[in-house]
């Protein structure tokens, strides 16, 4: 839309409605990503500006795990084919996705926060340039201790996860958040990132 200033020949380009911000949380297993996100979600519960969408996963919910929408592999494939997902990926033998409704939230200028795989970062940036990547991590010794305490993997699997943890995403808008102390400290740092202007 172009607006001519009264009494002058000047033409002012009206600024488009600002787009929202996509905040993608990544990091190694044992870093505490879900705990940090949940802490921020609770702190921002009264703020409609911030959206924390539930992920869609091809597994049943179990006590202690994140709340998510469950789909069978067949239903997941059908939804993917009709473009129902904003992002989707496969990890550890499961399919994951973020709902397509995220696009509407971003179009209305809201901040969307989600835990994703590093594999979809570039696709997310292409879809929505105003993307911030928050790498939640901890020192290797802390990660190893947390992974062993979970008891889900054997020693070889733990070593493999620690090796992958060394690789961090690059590109614009990447923030590293160290979660090696009290959870509330990491949550407060994360809230500061969410409330800060996006760096694109």
Q: Model segments located where?
A:
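ATP-binding Walker
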Residues: 31
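Post-Walker A helix-loop "phosphate-sensing" segment adjacent to the P-loop in P-loop NTPases
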Residues: 42-52
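ATP-dependent small-molecule kinase phosphotransfer cores
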Residues: 53-112, 116-118
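Conserved phosphate-donor/acceptor-positioning beta-strand/loop module used by diverse small-molecule
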Residues: 111-117, 127-150
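P-loop (Walker A) phosphate-binding loop of NTP-binding proteins
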Residues: 26-28
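Extreme N-terminal, non-catalytic leader segments
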Residues: 1-22
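Walker A/P-loop
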Residues: 34
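Small-molecule kinase domains that catalyze NTP-dependent phosphoryl transfer to phosphate-bearing small molecules
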Residues: 149-200
């Amino acid at each position: 839309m172009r607006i001519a200033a009264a009494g002058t020949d000047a033409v002012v380009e009206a600024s488009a409605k600002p787009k929202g911000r996509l905040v993608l949380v990544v990091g190694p297993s044992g870093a505490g990503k879900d705990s940090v996100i949940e802490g921020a979600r609770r702190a921002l519960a009264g703020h409609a500006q911030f959206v924390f969408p539930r992920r869609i996963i091809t597994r049943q919910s179990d006590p202690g795990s994140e709340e998510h929408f469950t789909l069978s592999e067949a239903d997941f494939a059908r939804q993917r084919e009709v473009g129902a997902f904003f992002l989707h990926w496969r990890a550890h033998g499961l399919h994951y996705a973020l709902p397509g409704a995220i696009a509407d939230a971003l179009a209305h200028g809201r901040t969307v926060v989600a835990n994703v795989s590093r594999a979809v970062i570039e696709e997310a940036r292409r879809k929505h340039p105003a993307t911030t990547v928050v790498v939640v991590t901890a020192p290797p010794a802390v990660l190893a201790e947390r992974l062993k305490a979970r008891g889900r993997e054997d020693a070889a699997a733990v070593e493999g996860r620690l090796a992958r943890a060394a690789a961090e995403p690059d590109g614009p808008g990447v923030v590293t958040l160290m979660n090696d102390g009290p959870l509330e400290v990491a949550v407060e740092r994360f809230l500061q990132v969410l409330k800060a202007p996006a760096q694109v």
